[in-house]
Amino acid sequence: MEGKRSQGQGYMKKKSYLVEEDMETDTDEEEEVGRDRVRGSRGSINRGGSLRLCQVDRCTADMKEAKLYHRRHKVCEVHAKASSVFLSGLNQRFCQQCSRFHDLQEFDEAKRSCRRRLAGHNERRRKSSGESTYGEGSGRRGINGQVVMQNQERSRVEMTLPMPNSSFKRPQIR
C-alpha cells in the first residue's frame, strides 16, 4: 500500500508540472500577440516589455503604472483631464463618454463629454423623468405591482386606500 501511495503522489507531481508548463506556453503566446499589436501600431517594439505610451503627440508618460482605464484607452491621466491636447496635428479633448479624442468644436465650453453624447444622455433623462411619478429609475411600484404613471398634464394620480375603521391589518415585517 505504501508503494501505491508514493506512486500516486509522483503522478500528481508530474501532472501539476504539465499544467504549469502549459500555462507558461499560454502566457508566452499572449505576450507574442501583444507584441504584434504594438508592432503594428507603433512600428517597432520594446524588447523589455510591451511599449505603453500615451497616444498624445510627444507625451512620454509611462503607462505601466497607470490605472487600468488609462492603459485601456492609451491616454495618461494628465491628458485625459486636459482641456485641450495636440493630437494628429489638431487641438482635441478627451471625451469621458466616448473614451476618445474629439475636435474642440464638438464640446460645449469646458465640458468633458461631446455634444452628441450629452444630447443622448439628456434625452434619456427627460424621457424617463416624465414617465414615472417617483423620478428617474427609482423603481417604486404602485397598486398591484404596476408602475404608477402620470398623464401628459402631470396631474395627480388618484389612489383609494382602505378605510381606517375596516378590518384591514398591516402585516408586520420582522
UniProtKB/Swiss-Prot annotation:
UniProt-annotated location(s): Nucleus; Cytoplasm
Comment on bound cofactor: Binds 2 Zn(2+) ions per subunit.
Segments of this protein annotated with the region Disordered: 1-42, 118-148, 155-174
Keywords: Cytoplasm, DNA-binding, Metal-binding, Nucleus, Transcription, Transcription regulation, Zinc, Zinc-finger
Tissue specificity of this protein: Expressed in the rib meristem and inter-primordial tissue of the inflorescence apex.
PROSITE patterns associated with the record: ZF_SBP
Polar residues: bias regions: 163-174
Positions bound to Zn(2+) 1: C54, C59, C76, H79
Matches recorded under SUPFAM superfamilies: SBT domain
Zn-finger segments (SBP-type): 51-128
Entry superkingdom: Eukaryota
Annotated positions binding Zn(2+) 2: C95, C98, H102, C114
Record's note on what induces expression: Negatively regulated by microRNAs miR156 and miR157.
One protein family per Pfam: SBP
GO molecular function, one term: zinc ion binding
Cofactor(s) for this UniProt protein: Zn(2+)
GO biological process: flower development; regulation of DNA-templated transcription; regulation of vegetative phase change
Described function: Trans-acting factor that binds specifically to the consensus nucleotide sequence 5'-TNCGTACAA-3' of AP1 promoter. Promotes both vegetative phase change and flowering.
Protein name: Squamosa promoter-binding-like protein 4
